[in-house]
A protein has these predicted regions:
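Ligand-binding clefts of soluble mixed alpha/beta catalytic domains
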Residues: 571, 603, 645-781
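C-terminal accessory/interaction regions of large nucleic acid-associated machines
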Residues: 720-918
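Short glycine-rich or small-residue beta-strand-to-loop segments that form or flank ligand, phosphate
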Residues: 112, 408-411, 498-502, 532-535, ...
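Conserved alpha/beta core surface patches that mediate binding of polyanionic ligands
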Residues: 269-287, 479, 510-515, 547-559, ...
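Active-site cores of enzymes that catalyze phosphoryl transfer or operate on phosphate-rich substrates
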Residues: 367, 373-375, 385, 417, ...
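Active-site-proximal structural scaffolding
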Residues: 38, 56, 104, 243, ...
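Often metal-dependent polyanion-binding catalytic scaffolds in large enzymes
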Residues: 2-462, 473, 530, 623, ...
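Catalytic or ion-translocation cores adjacent to nucleophile or general acid/base/metal-coordination motifs
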Residues: 15, 301-332, 520-700
């Protein structure tokens, strides 16, 4: 099923397997190239399974055949109570129920491997379609219809004029913040194999003869290894190891593709002048990270860890810049006679000689009469010295390095070597401007209660323990600020200046952080510069946000930062906890209202606001297409800046493939620009006012319905019984515990990710839709709801996301999970609300079944459903057997471990099939 995180266009093809056994009717609609690749992958997988165990292959084919038939029965509606013989889902249940635990583990692996291959083929096809579209674009066209960013910029020019459009372009900023939230159920070893299989599949299309035969052999080897590799990691990653996620994405995509984003925009705006004149596109991509710095509820993230991760990031980007500087420099072989160096460049060379004659003599020896090359080679050596912390040669800041690059660029331009000035050298400048010497801006986060407790401890026992020993957590809090300061000293203020307070309740929470920052240092000059960011997460906090901000700007440290930054201020909004706290409908509307009120408040105080969106990948955590989310924001809340969290499976889906990474960044940048277009601002303002009464009524009814469910006596233990919540907590997919610290005792303490993840695994997706059906039923005005869907971007995006979530639910499977709990009253509430919500969503969008008019996405979900069903059946049977036999004390420790491992295998497989976790 196509990931919830990506906007689906006709370029995004559905996936289906074919081969021996029953075929789904949708296969006839598959593009030939996609079908061919899927045929190849399934053929190889079946051969791999046969080589491993013929009985396993036979069982795989048998389950697959009945699962496909069961899916046809579900979608065609031929299954009725009077025709039970055609219930092929029950046949799947009967087959799987007779398989022993060990063989069930292998069967789960087989289907999980299939999903990895299916996802890969889908991704490859999307890339090929994008390439085909771009190849078909006429160079004479005013804009590139495939490049959303150029389309958005031209719309701004048409509506506002070239000058104002350029002003907005220069203000453009996209801040993705990569987090270690444990929502990627694939282990890294699996990701590496998937990447290699992707490369082999691409090569397979181009090769022939013996080369193709060798490529096929390697493809067999990789798919065989993928099947034989446990989908479950051997241990949880450490926070330092989690940083490798960013390093992988940096190496494989970001470092090289982000300059391509800038270059593609320049190519269409400047036309034939691109690469011959100074660039138009600013370096607007500013990545951040919580990995190694988010300590909210994660005791594994310490001050020592933060220092290690910061050093890891810095050394890695410096190494990449060194390699690129040397590569670009070696190609600047222009002689002084043809390309005379400028006086400014000669001055830089003399400065380098004063710094180290050894380096300049070495460079001059290599590059006689090639001063541009010689200067660049010394710059590369200085980057190496920066990694080694050589005080005599190192760069003090990235700004100094960029200044040297621009000196070389100006010299080349003055010598009329413009292609050299604005070619690869400009790409290098963009890389330095984007990633700096820090790679990502580390953002620290901690719970507000931790700060208040630390201050209470200090007041009781004294800063240095004069009246008794301080608590270990207090020492850690103070060490955190010292770590932040040391990172700033090494890599610059930009490397780590943001400190986020989760569960911000009052301005006092802000004061606490500034006070602790001061107390951590003996000398005032050592106190680091920080921007404290309130994070409003729960419904009540969102409603009180403006009052808190009003008090916050009275704090002297905040006033000083506002003055120093020209009025810049950042506020974070939490989509996850607000959804678990209030339900999806109320959370969506409360967040929109809070953004609107905060934007108006900021404007009244002349504050340059950035709203930071703490969105997850799943719809229940604010997920969905990022570009549509931007366009639905209230007026004044974006201002050409968009910042959001990116995590887990979202990082891999959006940035794992270079072509798709470019598309994603361009798409978000386009929406961020368009949000300032007068036509978009007017539409959002007018529609928000027009449908305010409707929104208020939906909010109240949905909220009451959601709370009625959560407040039902015994809900929390029932929830953990009818979902694999406990088992998900055992998955080694992140260093962070599934529950918050501070004494987690209830559903309130449960993190939102396992809340979402568990409902998705049970094929219910309750967190994405519960309460909306009742709200629509009580509102009753279908015409108004339909009109709002057509006119109001916020509502249409919300309804479309819910329709997609409903399409991934399966009432037949859901009933099997709900049967694990002995609560008919709760079962009825969930199933009744699911049916009611589906009925109203279909009425609103005008569909007879979910995603009827979103053919590509609907087909993708429908085609993948049978294989997810097979894994879901395996999972729910294992859960039922495990819990029943544990209660009766019938299992040995080893048997219990085998059942648990089977469940974890199915969790990984279902996540791969659904392509979302939390």
């Amino acid at each position: 099923m196509t990931t919830e995180n990506e906007q689906i266009t006709p370029a995004d093809a559905a996936i289906v397997s074919s081969g021996t056994g029953t075929k789904g009717p949708e296969e006839r609609d598959l593009p030939a190239s996609l079908k061919e690749e899927m045929d190849l992958c399934l053929q190889i997988l079946r051969e791999v399974l046969g080589e491993f165990d013929e009985k396993l292959l036979a069982k795989f084919d048998e389950v697959r055949e009945h699962a496909l038939k069961a899916s046809d029965e579900r979608f065609s509606g031929i299954l009725t109570d009077t025709n039970p013989d055609q219930d092929d889902l029950q046949k799947v249940v009967d087959i799987v129920d007779k398989v022993d635990v060990h063989d069930a583990q292998l069967l789960a692996r087989a289907f999980t491997t299939y999903f990895h291959l299916a996802n890969l083929c889908e991704e490859n096809y999307r890339v090929s379609v994008l390439h085909s579209r771009e190849a078909a674009v006429d160079d004479a066209q005013a804009v590139d219809p495939v490049n959303e960013m150029t389309c958005a910029y031209h719309q701004l020019i048409n509506e506002m004029g070239p000058a104002r459009a350029k002003e907005l372009l220069d203000q453009l900023e996209f801040h993705p913040v990569f987090t270690a939230h444990p929502t990627e159920a694939r282990r890294k070893a699996v990701e590496g194999k998937i990447r290699r299989i992707s490369q082999l599949l691409e090569a397979h299309k181009l090769l022939g003869g013996s080369d193709k035969k060798e490529n096929s052999r390697r493809l067999f080897n990789e798919i065989d290894a993928l099947f034989r590799t446990s989908p479950i990691a051997l241990k949880k990653p450490t926070p330092v190891e989690e940083a490798d996620t960013i390093l992988d994405i940096f190496d494989n995509t970001l470092f090289y593709t982000i300059p391509q984003v800038y270059r593609r925009f320049d190519d269409w705006v400047l036309g034939d002048k691109a690469g011959l004149v100074p660039p138009v596109c600013p370096a607007f991509f500013h990545p951040g990270s919580w990995i190694g710095s988010d300590r909210d509820g994660n005791p594994n993230v310490t001050a020592k860890v933060s220092r290690q991760v910061a050093r890891k990031f810095s050394d890695h980007v410096l190494g990449a810049l060194e390699i690129e500087t040397r590569r670009v420099g070696k190609n600047l072989t222009m002689e002084a006679e043809t390309t005379p160096p400028s006086a400014e460049l000669k001055s830089l060379w003399n400065h380098q000689k004063e710094m180290s004659e050894r380096l300049t003599d070495k460079a001059a020896l290599i590059s006689t009469k090639e001063l541009h090359r010689a200067v660049m080679l010394v710059m590369a050596d200085r980057l190496k010295a920066t990694i080694d912390r050589d005080a005599d040669l190192m760069y003090r800041s990235c700004e100094d390095y960029i200044a040297d690059l621009k000196t070389v660029q100006r010299s080349l331009a003055e010598a009329n070597a413009k292609r050299s000035a604005y070619g690869p050298l400009q790409d290098l400048i963009w890389q330095a401007e984007t990633f700096g010497f820090h790679m990502v801006e580390m953002e620290f986060r901690q719970h507000s209660v931790v700060h208040s407790r630390a201050l209470e401890d200090i007041r009781e026992h004294g800063l240095h323990g004069e009246r008794g020993e301080l608590q270990p957590m207090t020492h850690e809090v103070l060490d955190t600020f010292r770590a932040l300061g040391s990172i700033q000293k090494r890599n610059g203020i930009k490397a780590a200046r943001r400190y986020i307070i989760s569960f911000t309740k009052s301005a006092q929470n802000i004061k606490d952080v500034y006070e602790l920052n001061r107390l951590a240092f003996s000398h005032p000059e050592d106190v680091p510069t920080i921007d404290v960011i309130p994070l409003f997460e729960q419904l009540e906090d969102l409603q009180n946000s403006v009052d808190v901000l009003e008090e916050m700007i009275k704090i002297p440290e905040v006033q000083a930062r506002l003055k120093a930054t020209g009025g810049k201020m950042e506020v974070m909004l939490g989509y996850s906890d607000s959804s678990k706290d209030a339900g999806p409908t109320s959370a969506t509307l409360a967040l929109h209202s809070a953004q609107e009120r905060i934007a108006k408040w900021a404007e009244s105080h002349d504050i340059d606001l950035t709203l930071f969106h703490g969105r997850g990948g799943a719809v229940g955590r604010g997920g969905g297409p990022a570009n549509r989310a931007v366009l639905a924001q209230p007026v004044g809340s974006v201002k050409c800046r968009f910042k959001l969290t990116e995590q887990g499976e979202v990082i891999f889906a959006r940035y794992g493939n270079p072509v798709l990474a470019i598309r994603h960044v361009e798409s978000v940048a386009a929406a961020t620009l368009l949000q300032s277009a007068p036509s978009v601002e007017k539409r959002n303002t007018d529609m928000t006012k027009k449908y305010a009464d409707m929104a208020s009524k939906l909010d109240e009814a949905a909220h009451n319905r959601f709370l009625d469910l959560l407040n039902t006596d015994g809900f929390a233990p029932w929830f953990s019984t009818v979902t694999p919540l406990t088992e998900i907590g055992l998955l080694p997919i992140g260093s962070r515990p599934a529950k918050r610290g501070l004494g987690a005792k209830s559903l309130d303490d449960l993190r939102t990710i396992p809340w979402i993840f568990s409902w998705a695994q049970a094929r219910i997706n309750l967190a994405a839709w519960y309460g909306l059906g009742t709200a629509c039923e009580q509102f009753g005005d279908l015409n108004t709801l339909r009109q709002a869907y057509e006119e109001w971007p916020l509502f249409s995006t919300f309804i479309d996301n819910i329709e997609m979530s409903l399409a991934k639910t399966d009432e037949r499977i859901a009933k099997m999970y709900l049967a694990l709990g002995d609560r008919e009253d709760l079962n009825k509430k969930v199933l009744d609300e699911m049916e009611l919500t589906r009925k109203w969503v279909l009425k609103i969008v005008g569909d007879e079944w979910p995603l009827q008019h979103r053919h590509v996405l609907g087909q993708a979900i429908r085609i993948r459903s049978p294989y997810v069903d097979a894994l879901s059946v395996t999972q729910v049977l294992a859960l039922g057997s495990l819990r029943k036999r544990v209660d009766k004390e019938e299992l040995t420790h080893g048997q219990k471990e085998n059942y648990t491992y089977l469940i974890l295998c199915t969790v990984s497989g279902v996540a791969a099939g659904l392509q979302n976790t939390g």
